[in-house]
């Protein structure tokens, strides 16, 4: 049997593509464009895992397909290389994070090239390259000039052991840090913020203009969290103080029986009575130790302390006790709520716990038993009695505005983006603080502001980044003699990834971020493929920066990514014991088709789980490429199932894909190739071209491969293979298995040219039509024969063909035919006696 040698074929074609710049981005202005983008990776020390190539293979197939269809292709790759892991490694080993990062990038690039992706490496970007982050800094200065980057004292999640603040997303529910499991405390610090809230409405509205999965759009909508309601002002009894509450249900104001302020609310200390001062101070201390996530957990027990003060309900003059409780966050809304316990579960539980009044203002339910959270007509509500929800909201807003105690208000859950990190390994923020109290942005002519090389990258301990220790970099003097200090905070890893897709379009431009004409030519990105874990933050931040650049006239489109696709996760083989605990693969043995724990002998259940080092089930693509070849890995990952499904890795599936490619190789290299078309494969070949073309376009790669298998099976039944069909088939499989595609193309054509630019095959519609049809012949209601006849034969012709058939004649010999019923294209029924 013939097998192809991937160890010879794959490096040969990879060298050919590199030497000939086969995948250089097309610049022919007469061609349509196609921009296929992968979410660029963080180059970790662990290297590529088999999950990475799934998305990369998908965009590569699309790029190769569109290239053959005559498009200019932009298909680039780069590195999101700033970030905490490199800094942590550098601190642990004493190495420079830049050196560590460069080594990791070289390894990633080697692994990626071994998989045969058609990237244009002339466009490679690296977020840690000063020539790249010059423009990240330039964008920051534009945000600063527009008032969209500002400094504020904000409570942050401070981790003493890490010497930095961390984002809400990096705090675990138990209030410790995701990295290291260290205690997290809330403390106010001077931070840089980006005013993403100024773009909230546009970020929401423009989701309608993009072709994204609805689930991702919903996640962004929920994150932005638009709600329309009213602001209501409550005066504090016996003081000149007041506070504002935002509510989406101003119609329930008659049912507000108490108010709750966040422990951090500015008013708390001013209104707390002497009797309550100690209890309030103690509660505030406890609250500062909890993360926002822990504080707002619905399942947790409600805690709170009365301030001793009362607010006056503006609509009925009733006194409402003012409490503080940690489930109200200072960073959300106004940091104060009016509680309507009859119609809100959290307020109801709080009121029951602390014996506060519960007054129903909507008809229905029994508020002694539980909060009534459905809609009903208004009761106990004065001028709103008898009204439904919409009418009552409108009437109450009208009343609040007329009385000067409130107004209609649209709010968003979205918060401004905390943009500073107290770390070394990030882009320096290009701002100088002068001793006269002013701050200025570093002028464009002085960008990039390069990150200084320093041995001492440990956190400073003062809450500033390690850059505070680099005195000669830190201290500057103006021409007029005024001294200044550079900003010591660095940007978060999100910064470089918020605009990298723009730099690929014009990566070597030293004068501007990218040329306007090139941006016009290539934007928006046609397809963006990556993991759903970036659904909210990265995509929201990139959309925000894009809109700012649109307003500045830098980019020509409102949205960066026209179509988004999230590939599923490739799960590892893993095993569970009877308690449901996962068992590492090196502790498992297989006996008679079942799996057992090596140490305990317990039979285990196979259960796919996320690949992880601890379960020892991470599959390294290097091993797969060595044993089976890159083409096998590519075909297997596309054939596992739908691209957006999460599916378990299987060695058997990998072997199956390799066997299929060997059959393809044998078909083209050992079958007699002829210039004469017998017509036997007309239908299946044209069906295959049509199906593969449509399915690749729709990213249904698994069904496209299934159709290629159908063709191979059909072709193997024939003695000879028509040359045009052999070539067309090789073109169809080349995007999936590009090394094998190139090798077989040379076997058929000896052209010496890459298959990459050969025009994609077309199909003949007339060959898809069935000219023959199978009919059944029944005698006494039982099927006695199946005949293939020309389509649309008349009843008379069908009867003639059926009665002439040998099997039928044997059945009816010596019998009387009572009648013959013929149904064209279906059956002939013969009634005999």
From Swiss-Prot:
<dbReference type="InterPro" id="IPR009080">
    <property type="entry name" value="tRNAsynth_Ia_anticodon-bd"/>
</dbReference>
<dbReference type="InterPro" id="IPR002302">
    <property type="entry name" value="Leu-tRNA-ligase"/>
</dbReference>
<dbReference type="GO" id="GO:0005524">
    <property type="term" value="F:ATP binding"/>
</dbReference>
<dbReference type="InterPro" id="IPR002300">
    <property type="entry name" value="aa-tRNA-synth_Ia"/>
</dbReference>
<dbReference type="InterPro" id="IPR001412">
    <property type="entry name" value="aa-tRNA-synth_I_CS"/>
</dbReference>
<keyword id="KW-0648">Protein biosynthesis</keyword>
<keyword id="KW-0963">Cytoplasm</keyword>
<comment type="similarity">
    <text>Belongs to the class-I aminoacyl-tRNA synthetase family.</text>
</comment>
<dbReference type="Pfam" id="PF09334">
    <property type="entry name" value="tRNA-synt_1g"/>
</dbReference>
<keyword id="KW-0547">Nucleotide-binding</keyword>
<dbReference type="InterPro" id="IPR015413">
    <property type="entry name" value="Methionyl/Leucyl_tRNA_Synth"/>
</dbReference>
<dbReference type="GO" id="GO:0002161">
    <property type="term" value="F:aminoacyl-tRNA deacylase activity"/>
</dbReference>
<keyword id="KW-0067">ATP-binding</keyword>
<dbReference type="Pfam" id="PF13603">
    <property type="entry name" value="tRNA-synt_1_2"/>
</dbReference>
<dbReference type="InterPro" id="IPR014729">
    <property type="entry name" value="Rossmann-like_a/b/a_fold"/>
</dbReference>
<feature type="binding site">
    <location>
        <position position="613"/>
    </location>
    <ligand>
        <name>ATP</name>
    </ligand>
</feature>
<dbReference type="InterPro" id="IPR009008">
    <property type="entry name" value="Val/Leu/Ile-tRNA-synth_edit"/>
</dbReference>
<dbReference type="GO" id="GO:0005829">
    <property type="term" value="C:cytosol"/>
</dbReference>
<dbReference type="GO" id="GO:0004823">
    <property type="term" value="F:leucine-tRNA ligase activity"/>
</dbReference>
<dbReference type="Pfam" id="PF00133">
    <property type="entry name" value="tRNA-synt_1"/>
</dbReference>
<keyword id="KW-0436">Ligase</keyword>
<feature type="short sequence motif" description="'KMSKS' region">
    <location>
        <begin position="610"/>
        <end position="614"/>
    </location>
</feature>
<dbReference type="InterPro" id="IPR013155">
    <property type="entry name" value="M/V/L/I-tRNA-synth_anticd-bd"/>
</dbReference>
<dbReference type="InterPro" id="IPR025709">
    <property type="entry name" value="Leu_tRNA-synth_edit"/>
</dbReference>
<dbReference type="Pfam" id="PF08264">
    <property type="entry name" value="Anticodon_1"/>
</dbReference>
<keyword id="KW-0030">Aminoacyl-tRNA synthetase</keyword>
<dbReference type="GO" id="GO:0006429">
    <property type="term" value="P:leucyl-tRNA aminoacylation"/>
</dbReference>
<feature type="short sequence motif" description="'HIGH' region">
    <location>
        <begin position="41"/>
        <end position="52"/>
    </location>
</feature>
<protein>
    <recommendedName>
        <fullName>Leucine--tRNA ligase</fullName>
        <ecNumber>6.1.1.4</ecNumber>
    </recommendedName>
</protein>
């Amino acid at each position: 049997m013939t097998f192809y040698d991937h160890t010879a074929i794959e490096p040969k074609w990879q060298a050919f593509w590199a030497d000939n710049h086969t995948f250089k981005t097309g610049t022919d202005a007469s061609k349509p464009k196609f921009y296929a983008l992968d979410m660029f990776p963080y180059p970790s020390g662990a290297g590529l895992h088999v999950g990475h190539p799934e998305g990369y293979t998908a965009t590569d197939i699309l790029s190769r397909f569109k290239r053959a269809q005559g498009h200019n292709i932009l298909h680039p790759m780069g590195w999101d290389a700033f970030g905490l892991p490199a800094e942590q490694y550098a601190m642990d080993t004493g190495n420079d994070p830049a050196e560590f990062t460069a080594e990791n990038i070289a390894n990633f690039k080697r692994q990626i090239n071994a998989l045969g992706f058609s990237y244009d490496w002339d466009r490679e970007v690296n977020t840690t390259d000063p020539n790249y982050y010059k423009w990240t800094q330039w964008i920051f200065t534009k945000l600063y000039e527009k008032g969209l980057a500002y400094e504020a004292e904000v409570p942050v999640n401070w981790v003493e052991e890490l010497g930095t603040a961390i984002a809400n997303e990096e705090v675990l529910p138990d209030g410790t840090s995701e990295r290291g499991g260290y205690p997290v405390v809330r403390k106010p610090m001077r931070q840089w913020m980006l005013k993403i809230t100024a773009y909230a409405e546009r970020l929401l509205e423009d989701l309608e203009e993009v072709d994204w999965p609805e689930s991702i759009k919903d996640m962004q909508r929920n994150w932005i969290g638009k709600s329309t309601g009213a602001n209501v002002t409550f005066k504090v009894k016996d003081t000149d103080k007041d506070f504002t509450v935002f509510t989406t249900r101003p119609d329930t104001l008659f049912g507000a029986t108490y108010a709750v302020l966040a422990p951090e609310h500015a008013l708390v200390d001013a209104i707390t009575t002497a009797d309550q001062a100690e209890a309030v101070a103690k509660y505030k201390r406890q609250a500062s130790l909890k993360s926002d996530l822990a504080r707002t957990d619905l399942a947790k027990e409600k805690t709170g302390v009365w301030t001793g003060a009362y607010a006056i309900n503006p609509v009925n003059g009733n006194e409402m006790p003012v409490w503080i409780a940690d489930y109200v966050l200072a960073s959300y809304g106004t940091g104060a709520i009016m509680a309507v316990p009859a119609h809100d579960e959290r307020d109801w539980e709080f009121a029951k716990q602390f014996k506060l009044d519960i007054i129903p203002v909507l008809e229905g339910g029994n508020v002694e038993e539980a909060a009534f959270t459905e809609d009903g007509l208004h009761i106990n509500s004065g001028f709103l009695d008898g009204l439904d929800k919409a009418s009552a909201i409108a009437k109450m807003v009208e009343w609040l505005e007329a009385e000067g105690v409130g107004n209609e208000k649209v709010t968003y859950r979205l918060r401004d983006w905390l943009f500073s990190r107290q770390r070394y390994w990030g882009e320096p923020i290009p701002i100088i603080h002068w001793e006269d109290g002013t701050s200025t942005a570093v002028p464009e002519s002085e960008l990039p502001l390069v990150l200084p090389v320093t041995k001492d990258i440990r956190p400073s301990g003062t809450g500033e980044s390690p850059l505070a220790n680099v005195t000669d970099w830190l201290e500057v003097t103006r021409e007029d003699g005024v001294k200044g200090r550079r900003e010591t905070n660095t940007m978060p890893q999100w910064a470089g990834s918020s605009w990298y897709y723009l730099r690929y379009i014009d990566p070597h431009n030293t004068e501007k971020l990218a040329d306007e004409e090139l941006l016009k030519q290539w934007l928006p990105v046609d397809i963006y493929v990556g993991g759903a874990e970036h659904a909210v933050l990265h995509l929201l931040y990139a959309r925000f920066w894009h809109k700012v650049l649109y307003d500045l006239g830098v980019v020509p489109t409102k949205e960066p990514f026209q179509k988004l696709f999230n590939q599923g996760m490739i799960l590892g083989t893993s095993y569970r014991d009877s308690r449901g605990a996962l068992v590492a693969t090196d502790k498992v043995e297989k006996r008679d088709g079942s799996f057992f724990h090596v140490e305990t002998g317990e039979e285990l259940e196979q259960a796919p789980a996320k690949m992880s080092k601890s379960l020892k089930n991470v599959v390294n693509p290097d091993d797969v490429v060595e044993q089976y070849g890159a083409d096998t890995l590519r075909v297997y990952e596309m054939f596992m199932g739908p691209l957006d499904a999460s599916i378990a890795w299987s060695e058997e599936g990998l072997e199956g894909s390799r066997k299929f490619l060997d059959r393809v190789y044998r078909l083209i290299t050992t079958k007699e190739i002829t210039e004469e078309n017998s017509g036997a494969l007309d239908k299946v070949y044209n069906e295959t071209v049509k199906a593969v073309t449509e399915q690749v376009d729709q990213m249904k790669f698994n069904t496209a491969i299934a159709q290629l298998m159908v063709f191979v099976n059909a072709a193997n039944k024939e003695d000879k293979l028509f040359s045009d069909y052999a070539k067309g088939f090789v073109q169809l499989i080349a995007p999936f298995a590009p090394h094998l595609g190139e090798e077989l193309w040379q076997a058929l054509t000896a052209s010496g040219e890459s298959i990459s630019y050969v025009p994609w095959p077309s199909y003949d519609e007339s060959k898809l039509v069935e000219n023959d049809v199978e009919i059944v012949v029944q005698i006494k209601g039982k099927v006695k024969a199946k005949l293939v006849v020309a389509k649309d034969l008349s009843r008379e012709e069908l009867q003639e063909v059926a009665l002439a058939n040998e099997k039928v004649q044997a059945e009816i010999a010596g019998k009387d035919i009572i009648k013959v019923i013929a149904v064209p294209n279906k059956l002939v029924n013969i009634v005999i006696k």
